[in-house]
Amino acid sequence: MASLQISGSVKFEPFVGFNRIRHFRPIASLGFPRFRRRFSIGRSLLLRRSSSFSGDSRESDEERFITDAERDGSGSVLGFQLTPPGDQQTVSTSTGEITHHEEKKEAIDQIVMADFGVPGNRAVEEGAAEVGIPSGKAEVVNNLVFVTSEAAPYSKTGGLGDVCGSLPIALAGRGHRVMVISPRYLNGTAADKNYARAKDLGIRVTVNCFGGSQEVSFYHEYRDGVDWVFVDHKSYHRPGNPYGDSKGAFGDNQFRFTLLCHAACEAPLVLPLGGFTYGEKSLFLVNDWHAGLVPILLAAKYRPYGVYKDARSILIIHNLAHQGVEPAATYTNLGLPSEWYGAVGWVFPTWARTHALDTGEAVNVLKGAIVTSDRIITVSQGYAWEITTVEGGYGLQDLLSSRKSVINGITNGINVDEWNPSTDEHIPFHYSADDVSEKIKCKMALQKELGLPIRPECPMIGFIGRLDYQKGIDLIQTAGPDLMVDDIQFVMLGSGDPKYESWMRSMEETYRDKFRGWVGFNVPISHRITAGCDILLMPSRFEPCGLNQLYAMRYGTIPVVHGTGGLRDTVENFNPYAEGGAGTGTGWVFTPLSKDSMVSALRLAAATYREYKQSWEGLMRRGMTRNYSWENAAVQYEQVFQWVFMDPPYVS
């Protein structure tokens, strides 16, 4: 009979002929209510405890969950190993204790572990080199569990989806075991086919939140070395994007993402992916507020009972402006003990309250994640500093400042295979840093496609992004008449605020030979604009990282950006006099954020394009040879992984 064994100490035996969900009663010492956990794995499983003495096996028929007796030498729960039918050989799946070589530990200890988020500090990037981490494989491998509301190509609305679709693959390539957990969105469109290869694992988990028992199931696809796990529930099956539709944000988003977080905490314990679970010694990487309940649950509902005591959590902040704030009365919906309200409790300032009797009390999930996570990563070094300021902290600056010693900034990477001008299937001509002669043909093809006069000598400026206040679209609107006086062409691609969409259409009607606006988003045209334009404009008010400037530099298109967040970190301001007149830099960084400073930077860039071709080619090649691959970012993440296990986990 096929059996499920755990390192010789615990054995699962299937009941022959049964195919129903079986309820397991957790052991009393864990303190969980009886209805807390329920799952099925195809046939029902009977858990028998067995121990070996002098070759004899003794079994107890008591049905139970794993106790301390079934842990390895470090105290971690052993993973589940599926034994092939007819083969009763025991296979050990102990995770083992993560250790560090003494010489590496000494090197790590020499790193100054403070103020990593301050702009200009390269501790994270240099740390990997200091301890001699190999470029191909990680020195210490981990069980990594990404929890996210979106992951490309399955679901994507912005940079978050790009990060969670690419970084896990890079880390898996370096030897880590990686799981990505996100909802299984079905909205009745062609995008549903993205989940076609994901198979139902036949496992059901029941969790307690929102005043009752909620059952979810799991789908799984193994791709590019990563376990892609999708939490399935009817609340994820509706038209629109992951967060809302044309009418606005979904009213039950708190429920939908609370469900995701509870399921994510259970997944490493119950999903036998590849034959065995990830187990308790997992490192959770939770992304933005949607996954922010995970570190709170680990601290409030698991560690007090000895579960996940060896796990750690890292909060990755992609955009601090979104915090998951809901009325205080919704706290009981989160499935947390009553005494943990202080972790997520939040009070709005007086000026933000709606009426005189409004106390301002609310629940802030991201605040709770900041309090309980073991370490915090932002998507650029500049943003790590900005979130501790009044201007960039969105009310959380004091809390973040108090945790400054555990905040690290790591710049996002890009998919260098998808964004490669020498092989890009979306552009008509290919080129590289060694030979950029075909780029001008991409420009002429774009002018023809958009119906603009074909003028290869005319500087062409592009903008790709959301049409909203954060992206500085109002600044472009104000500067439009001034820019149209110059001998330039301007192309914009994006959607968002209807008033800016209307403005784009009116600009195109007024300046038929100079301006084109494409309302919406189209992947092929975004590639062609990136390749065909000479300059890419990004006047964002704040930009945690930004990806378009990285794509632009990869394609030899010069970025002109506002000096904020990741834009300031990744674009080096052009200096034509450095290096004996050879010049340094990859673009123009303007500040302050004003129409005059932006127009001035654009005019400097256009003049350089027209009059100083050698300097322009230097700008192009320096940008094209920069390394912004995910493999480079993965090495920096590994340094933080080592640091997070040096300290005990958050408990209370």
UniProtKB/Swiss-Prot annotation:
Biological pathway: Glycan biosynthesis; starch biosynthesis
In terms of superkingdom, the source organism counts as Eukaryota
Identify the residues that bind ADP-alpha-D-glucose.
Answer: K156
Q: Which gene encodes it?
A: SS1
Instruction: Give the catalysed reaction(s), semicolon-separated.
Output: [(1->4)-alpha-D-glucosyl](n) + ADP-alpha-D-glucose = [(1->4)-alpha-D-glucosyl](n+1) + ADP + H(+)
UniProt function note: Involved in the synthesis of short glycan chains within amylopectin in leaves. Is required to generate chains up to about a degree of polymerization of 10 (DP10).
This one is known as Starch synthase 1, chloroplastic/amyloplastic
Q: Which GO terms describe its molecular function?
A: alpha-1,4-glucan glucosyltransferase (ADP-glucose donor) activity; alpha-1,4-glucan glucosyltransferase (UDP-glucose donor) activity
Presequence range in chain numbering: 1-49
Q: Which GO terms describe its cellular component?
A: amyloplast; chloroplast; chloroplast stroma; plastid
Q: Which GO terms describe its biological process?
A: amylopectin biosynthetic process; endosperm development; starch biosynthetic process
Chief localization class? plastid
Q: Which residues cross the membrane?
A: none
Task: Look up the EC number in the record and give it.
Answer: 2.4.1.21
Asked if the keyword Plastid belongs to this entry, the reply reads: yes
According to the UniProt entry, the coiled-coil residues are: none
Organism (species): Arabidopsis thaliana (Mouse-ear cress)
Induction pattern: Circadian-regulation with the lowest levels at the end of the dark period.
PANTHER family cross-referenced by the UniProt entry:
ALPHA AMYLASE DOMAIN-CONTAINING PROTEIN (PTHR45825:SF11), GRANULE-BOUND STARCH SYNTHASE 1, CHLOROPLASTIC/AMYLOPLASTIC (PTHR45825)
Q: What happens when the gene is disrupted?
A: No visible phenotype under normal growth conditions, but mutant plants have reduced starch content in leaves.
| Entry-linked HAMAP family | Glycogen_synth
Class in the EC hierarchy, top level: transferase
Please tell me in which tissues this protein is expressed.
Expressed in roots, leaves, stems, buds and flowers.
Location in or out of the cell = Plastid, Chloroplast; Plastid, Amyloplast
What keywords would UniProt list here? Amyloplast, Chloroplast, Glycosyltransferase, Plastid, Starch biosynthesis, Transferase, Transit peptide
Q: Does the keyword Ribonucleoprotein apply?
A: no
- InterPro entries found in the cross-reference section: Glyco_trans_1, GS/SS, Starch_synth_cat_dom
Q: Which family does it belong to?
A: Belongs to the glycosyltransferase 1 family. Bacterial/plant glycogen synthase subfamily.
